[in-house]
Design a protein with these regions (language model features):
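Short, low-complexity N-terminal intrinsically disordered segments enriched in polar/charged residues
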Residues: 22-63, 67, 71, 121, ...
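Hydrophobic/aromatic beta-strand elements that line small-molecule binding cavities or substrate pockets
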Residues: 111-116, 128-131, 142-147, 158
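A solvent-exposed, acidic/Ser-Thr-rich amphipathic alpha-helical stretch
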Residues: 66-118
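Bacterial N-terminal signal peptides that target proteins for export
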Residues: 2-15
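Short beta-strand edge/turn micro-motifs at domain boundaries
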Residues: 145-168
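Gram-negative bacterial Sec-dependent N-terminal signal peptides
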Residues: 13-23
């Protein structure tokens, strides 16, 4: 009988600890599920806001970046080459990434297809864009953008694209001489 008593004394605290740990895990899982449920409307709002902004851009609108990006956006273009890098603030992003490219286009980039997913504070957009360069040659590219959202705007963005066609437009076509340093067209 003494052996059983020792077994119970060892097993009982072990079982109690496991039950407490299991309860804590279930409690954390329930809290996480409740958090997800409470943020579900915001996740859907972010997804719809980005989708609607893309639709307006596709239809000819030109306010996508000012509409969707926080003034303090941190935008990273992944990859290697002269166009890859991190831009801090919408003014930096506009001056160093948007303006040099857009100034070399006859027709602006327009999304021609898109897919959007949202999870938590992130919205992921996979899209294809087309434009015409000033020399009449077409520009086509596929993009994947990952936005981290706050207050209905992107505060961080990570962009994946084929930089070769982008850099080719910048290398092939000179920037117009009438574009002042602050003009972002």
């Amino acid at each position: 009988m003494r052996g059983h008593s020792l077994t119970y004394r060892v097993k009982l605290p072990l079982v109690g600890a496991l039950l407490l740990a299991g309860g804590a895990t279930l409690s954390n899982a329930n809290a996480s599920a409740m958090e997800t449920e409470s943020s579900a409307p915001e996740v859907e709002r972010n997804k719809q806001a980005v989708g609607a902004a893309f639709d307006r851009w596709s239809a000819g609108g030109s306010n996508f970046f000012s509409e969707m990006l926080s003034p303090d956006i941190v935008w990273t273009i992944e990859g290697s080459g002269p166009s890859a890098g991190t831009f801090r603030g919408i003014a930096d992003f506009t001056a160093r990434a948007i303006k040099p490219f857009v100034s070399r286009l006859r027709e602006p980039v327009r999304p021609v297809s898109k897919r959007i997913w949202a999870d938590g504070e992130h919205v992921i957009i996979h899209w294809e864009g087309e434009a015409v360069a000033r020399d009449g040659k077409p520009y086509r590219n596929r993009y994947a953008w990952i936005f981290r959202m706050a207050g209905g705007r992107a505060i961080e963005a990570t962009a994946f694209l084929d930089l070769a066609p982008y850099d080719d437009v910048i290398r092939r076509i000179p920037e117009p001489s009438n574009m002042g340093a602050g003009d972002a067209r």
